[in-house]
Amino acid sequence: MNYRIYSVALALSLLTACGDKPTPLPQPTPTPTPTPAPTPTPEPTPPAYKDYEGYTLIFNQGLASVLTSQPDGVGVASSLSLLDREAKTLLPVFSNKATPLNKEYDGQGYLCEGTLSEAGDYLVYMAKYDFTDDSEHASRLLLFDRRTMRLTKNLRITQPDGDEWVRHSFTFDDGTTYLSFDKKHFYRLNPETGKMTALTGIFGYPTGAASWQDKGYFFVRYESAAFVFDKGSTAARKVPIALSGAQIKEIFRMGAQVILRDTANRYYLFDLATGKVLAVFTLSEPIGRSVTIDPATHRIYYSGGTPNLNGAEAKERSVYTATIDTSRPTSEVQGLTSQLLYTIAGRTEADNRQGFKMQVGYHPDLKALMVSYLDQGRSGPLLHDLTKLLLLQLPTTPSESVKELRTFDLHYASDVSLLSVIRPRPTK
């Protein structure tokens, strides 16, 4: 009996103890940490431009007519237009007719072929042919103020000791111009007096010329080196470039840098300011008529062709691209695989000239490629030359393709040989 009472009492005490234990408070649910929204990549700030900086130069060198074995007149006159910074509007600078910027000048309508380049505050047009006087062979130098696009110097040039046209040239920022004529004659031209001084230390048939800041270069046939002139000098010094056993045979001008091709179909990325080779490479598809470069990435874009014929059919109408690695030693020849980027529609019997004379240029502000080509058939309603200019948006990922942004028709343009964006003057 006592045991039974004790058991009941023990059970009641345990129940009381358990009932007195406090009920645990509910724990607060942790607040999830919000995932921060991704910060959008800021749009690149356009450079602070002034005057015509940021505009694109579109230079049509024109074409001489040939009656027998030598040029005897202007077939298509040279011209220069500007494309505005948004790549929407064309502005003519000079042509065979009066323009808002340059109405009349000596030689107008009688000039064709040659080169256009930048030199300090000048735009330099060296016209190979000046047909204002049929009694002698002459060329002409036109210097434009690149801040206003107005013509400031206009000099007719004849060879002092012969009867040849200017073949290649380069100009320094003071307007001093170095000239090569067809048959191994080289001179320095003073634009203020018109006086020409013979150059020394250079010989051979010229194949190209270029300059940047205070250095100018001539390239001659059968040479593995470049002939260099410092600003103001009349004596050349040689800078070796090509690898042993090869000679430089072709030059592609791209502003501060050029690409040189040697007789073994190797290419050299050459810096004009330093006089140094930055890279040596080969391409699975050779460069045809023109090439341009993105200086930030050293990616090149070029028209296709063949090593010897400088263009053939579909390849001549195509744009290829490849990236040069400038961190590798120049003693190593890089074997680059070219990628097909864009091809103009196939020609037919009616438009068999479509795609000829392709020129390419890179627009660093729009990250776009400019491509021009002759857009005229053998027969049709047009009685003059027509060149098509395309603005192509470059892909940003491997899965994207080139997008055509807009097109322009360049009437009376037979041979566009320069598409280049005017950059602010470099500071030393």
Locations of regions flagged by a protein language model:
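An edge-strand/N-cap motif at the start of beta-rich repeat modules
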Residues: 41-99
